[in-house]
Amino acid sequence: MIYWGSMSYVVAGTVSPMVRSIVIEFPKIGSSVRADLWEDMEPELCEVLWGNLENPTKMVCRHPVSSGQEFSAEARPPRHPVKSGLGVGRNRYLYTTVPLGGVVYAVTGGFGGLSLYYGPCTEPLQIRGSVVARVIPGDLEKAAKVGRAVWDAQALEHKPMVIVVRRGE
């Protein structure tokens, strides 16, 4: 058995516990990455995210200009007022301490927002929300490629990158 973060994976015929996952699709470039939920670390926040992904959700990305290899995405706000809360998980992170492949979820004003960390960040501030998932090891290289594509869309093309986030199968 191999342990990676708080998750275990199948090795040489052993069986891993059932792990729910999310898929982040990038239709513009025909790519996607899968991330396993960290339900043991952030059970409440993972459950909120899972519930909000009953239907696939379109989101618009934005990439920081100078602080590192991370991008965030926001869904369209709801048409009607929603009950809002703090939306912070059990664990606190600085941008500099989110693990490679970390997916952060923050519940604010309806669906909230996701961030994907595909490399190091230099911003020494606390993130909003908490890490709820981690990109599977086999998709880390794809995560770096899609991160660069989000950067290119924003910085070079000046066109938004739209993603679709859904429950994994």
What are these regions (language model features)?
Residues I2-M41:
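N-terminal intrinsically disordered, low-complexity, charge/repeat-rich segments that act as generic
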